[in-house]
Amino acid sequence: MNTLAMDAEQLFLSKTIFEEEVFHEGFSLIAGIDEVGRGPLAGPVVAGACILPRGKVFAGVNDSKKLTPKERGKIRDILVNDSEVYYGLGVVSVERIDEINILEATKEAMAAAIANLPIHPDFLLVDGLHLPHKIPCKKIIKGDSKSASIAAASILAKEYRDDLMRELHQLYPDYGFDKHKGYGTAAHLAALKAFGPCDCHRKSFAPVRQVF
């Protein structure tokens, strides 16, 4: 094994400390939970839930924000094509976000991701939020950079949401959703000002509300 491969393996193993603690408490199916898309002005919020097999190394798994699109896509493909990896996704619409607020919508997306897992976890590691759930759970601040299963969930959610935003770009090409994925960049704000909001904008978010 070369030095780079060893470093990648060690980095991954350093992110399994929380999982190992929970394994030693007697749990066996530990799901990492993360969301993508709380901050954007447009598009849904998406959550991922991922159960990684104990003892198997997935080199390169890291906080999705620290990976290039190419790296994320490669790791996503590895995860979804591994029969020992179990994952679920939850999507909450713009309409629902505007109805109940982004925090509650995020919790709904996380609950949906857990429900969509093909097997039932017995413990949850959740990035940054206390998630009311019948399954025991632990909140980990900045969990996507500390927990392998949360990082894997963040990658799966990010890739799925980015694909959705590219689809929305085909329907609403004036806004550049394929580039900024709905976040409030200068180009996005300029397009909002020029064209007004479309159906996939979050009307409850101040920068969108201000252009009505």
Swiss-Prot record:
UniProt organism field: Chlamydia abortus (strain DSM 27085 / S26/3)
Alphabetized Pfam families for the sequence: RNase_HII (PF01351)
Name the record gives this protein: Ribonuclease HII
Keyword terms: Cytoplasm, Endonuclease, Hydrolase, Manganese, Metal-binding, Nuclease
Superkingdom of origin organism: Bacteria
GO molecular function ontology, one term from the record: manganese ion binding
Record-stated family: Belongs to the RNase HII family.
Binding site for a divalent metal cation: 34-35, 127
GO term, biological process aspect, one: DNA replication, removal of RNA primer
GO CC annotation: cytoplasm; ribonuclease H2 complex
Entries under HAMAP family matching the protein: RNase_HII_B (MF_00052_B)
Location of this chain's protein in the cell: Cytoplasm
Functional summary from the UniProt entry: Endonuclease that specifically degrades the RNA of RNA-DNA hybrids.
Cofactor info, note text: Manganese or magnesium. Binds 1 divalent metal ion per monomer in the absence of substrate. May bind a second metal ion after substrate binding.
Gene: rnhB
